[in-house]
Design a protein with these regions (language model features):
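Glycan-recognition and catalytic cores of secretory/periplasmic carbohydrate-active enzymes
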Residues: 1-216
């Protein structure tokens, strides 16, 4: 309840600061962020609202787990805190979130090894299937849990729990405590793998890892 109230107050503060965000029938992201051709979301726009032509690393149409699930969470949060209904966006937000989840589960979930891909192209072809636990698997679990709480779609909690099960199986350091961070596609550690735990408290997990318990 406290987190919901803080979320509501924060969004209302944004509304007061920039009323344009909430004016009209739909927000910028409802109008422009939905990939109507392939599903998921397009998120790289310039200051004029046009899809960018190039990026330093990927292409503007490539889809990363972080931004795809952030969009799912955003639409879900608007539904759950009542702002979507207040501004007449409820059905649009439901559809925007659902189609994002459809694309995300179909294209990002690693059906062979479990876990999630890092990035796909616009059509959903996997470009990088490595596992980066803190920035991807854990955050997307919380975002899918938000989607479930907003819509009741059982897939949200199903895949959040599947992810958590994979993390317990592959990422948990059962000797020292904490979690390993950086994995290859098959869950073998990359050479730059990191153990996320507080050195001053042996075995204490990183805060992001612990927060998954609150969502599930």
């Amino acid at each position: 309840m406290i987190m919901e109230q803080l979320m509501r107050e924060k969004l209302l503060t944004v509304k007061k600061r920039d009323g344009r965000l909430y004016e009209g029938k739909r927000s910028f992201w409802l109008e422009n962020g939905i990939d109507k051709e392939y599903g998921g979301y397009l998120v790289c726009f310039d200051s004029k609202g046009k899809l960018m032509k190039e990026l330093a690393v990927l292409t503007p149409e490539d889809k990363m787990i972080v931004t795809q699930t952030r969009m799912i969470w955003g639409f879900s949060a608007l539904l759950r805190n009542g702002l979507a209904k207040r501004y007449g966006w409820e059905e649009k937000c439901k559809e925007a979130a659902k189609q994002g989840v459809d694309f995300f589960i179909d294209k990002f979930w690693d059906k062979k090894n479990t876990g999630w891909a890092w990035v796909t192209d616009r059509k959903g072809n996997v470009l990088d299937n490595g596992k980066l636990v803190l920035r991807t698997d854990l955050l997307q679990s919380m975002r899918l849990a938000e989607y479930y709480m907003a819509t009741g779609d059982e897939r949200g909690i199903e895949y959040a729990e599947k992810t958590f099960d994979a993390l317990k199986k592959y990422a948990a350091d059962t000797f020292y405590g904490g979690y390993f961070e950086n994995f290859k596609e098959d869950w073998t550690l990359e050479s730059a793998g990191v153990l996320w735990r507080r050195p001053e408290i042996p075995g204490y997990p990183h805060a992001h890892h612990g927060s998954i318990y609150n969502s599930l």
